[in-house]
A protein has these predicted regions:
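Metal-dependent phosphoester/phosphodiester hydrolase catalytic core
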Residues: 1-146
C-alpha cells in the first residue's frame, strides 16, 4: 500500500526544488501524529519517512496542514509543525472527549474536540503564526514560528 504514486512523488519532489520562501503542504490525513489508530502517514512508515526526508533535505521552511480527525491539535517534530483542524460541521460528541484522551509525544498543547478551524498567518518573512480557533473565533491554541 502507498499514499502517493510514482507520478505524485515526482510532482511533489519537483515542487520542493522550486525557489520559494515557504511551503505549505496540505494532506487529508495527519503526517506527524503517531499514537492513534486512525488514518495517518505513520501507517505507511516508508512513505512517511520518504516525505520527512524530502522536507528535511529541501532546507526550506515547511508548514503541514491536515484534517479528517474531527478534532484540532498542533504537532511538532524538530522544527516542523503540523496544524490539524476539523471540523465545523461534524465535531465529536462531548461524552467521547471525556472517555477518549489521545496522547502523542509530538503534541504541542491540547487536543480540541469542539467545533474548530485553523488559521495560518504569514506575518512577514520571519514570523508564521498557527492558530486553532473555535466557532466563535476565539483562539484555542497558538504557536509563533520564527
Amino acid at each position: 500500500k502507498t499514499i502517493l504514486g510514482k507520478e505524485q512523488w515526482s510532482w511533489l519532489e519537483s515542487k520542493f526544488k522550486e525557489d520559494v520562501d515557504l511551503i505549505v503542504l496540505v494532506s487529508s490525513i495527519q503526517i506527524l501524529a503517531t499514537n492513534h489508530g486512525f488514518e495517518k502517514w505513520n501507517n505507511f512508515p516508508h512513505e512517511r519517512s520518504k516525505l520527512l526526508s524530502l522536507i528535511k533535505e529541501s532546507k526550506k521552511p515547511v508548514i503541514l496542514v491536515s484534517g479528517d480527525r474531527h478534532k484540532a491539535a498542533i504537532y511538532k517534530r524538530d522544527n516542523l509543525y503540523e496544524l490539524t483542524t476539523s471540523s465545523l460541521n461534524k465535531p465529536l460528541p462531548g461524552w467521547l472527549e471525556r472517555i477518549w484522551k489521545e496522547t502523542d509525544p509530538l503534541l504541542e498543547g491540547e487536543i480540541h474536540y469542539n467545533m474548530n478551524y485553523g488559521v495560518v498567518k504569514l506575518i512577514d518573512s520571519s514570523l508564521i503564526v498557527l492558530q486553532l480557533k473555535n466557532e466563535f473565533g476565539q483562539i484555542l491554541e497558538e504557536v509563533k514560528i520564527q
